[in-house]
C-alpha cells in the first residue's frame, strides 16, 4: 500500500499505514546504528549510537505492542524516506577520509533520521487521539520523547566538540 493510494480511505487506514512505515524505519535503524557506531571516531558519539540502538530496539517492541493494542497486524511497509537517509549516510561515510569530518557527517545523518521519526511519531500521536486511542497515544509519546532527547544530545555533541574538530 503506497501513501495516498486507494487503500487508504479512513483516518484509521492512514494511522495503520504510518505505523507500518515507522515500524519499518525503526527496524532499518536497528541495522544501521551498529554500522554508524563502528564508523564513529569520537568515543562519546560511538557510545551514543550504541545507546540509541538499545532504545530503538525498545521502540520496535513498543510499536509491536501498539499494533496489538490497536487490533492491527504487525507489519512493515517499505519506507523510501528512511532508506534514502541511510543510503546517503553510507555514501557520505564512504567518501569522507577525515575522521572528524566523518563524525560530523554521521551526526547529520543520525539527526536526519531523528527528525523523520519525530514528524512521524507526532502525527501518529495526534491521529491516535482523534481515533479515541489515548492509550496508544501515550505509548507513542514515550518514543517521541526519547527521539527528541536523542536529537538534543546529538545537537549538544555536535555543537560542543564534533563540529569544532571537523572545522579545524
Feature annotation, model-predicted:
Residues 1-168:
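Amphipathic alpha-helical hairpins
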Amino acid at each position: 500500500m503506497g501513501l495516498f493510494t486507494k487503500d487508504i480511505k479512513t483516518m484509521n487506514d492512514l494511522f495503520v499505514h504510518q505505523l507500518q512505515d515507522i515500524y519499518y524505519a525503526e527496524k532499518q535503524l536497528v541495522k544501521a546504528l551498529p554500522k554508524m557506531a563502528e564508523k564513529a571516531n569520537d568515543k562519546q558519539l560511538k557510545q551514543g549510537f550504541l545507546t540509541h540502538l538499545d532504545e530503538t530496539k525498545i521502540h520496535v517492541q513498543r510499536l509491536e505492542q501498539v499494533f496489538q493494542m490497536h487490533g492491527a497486524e504487525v507489519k512493515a511497509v517499505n519506507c523510501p524516506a528512511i532508506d534514502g537517509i541511510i543510503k546517503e549516510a553510507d555514501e557520505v561515510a564512504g567518501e569522507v577520509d577525515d575522521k572528524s569530518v566523518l563524525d560530523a557527517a554521521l551526526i547529520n545523518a543520525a539527526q536526519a533520521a531523528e527528525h523523520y521519526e519525530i514528524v512521524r511519531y507526532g502525527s501518529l500521536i495526534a491521529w491516535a487521539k482523534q481515533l479515541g486511542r489515548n492509550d496508544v497515544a501515550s505509548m507513542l509519546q514515550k518514543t517521541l520523547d526519547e527521539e527528541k532527547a536523542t536529537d538534543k544530545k546529538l545537537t549538544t555533541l555536535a555543537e560542543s566538540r564534533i563540529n569544532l574538530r571537523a572545522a579545524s
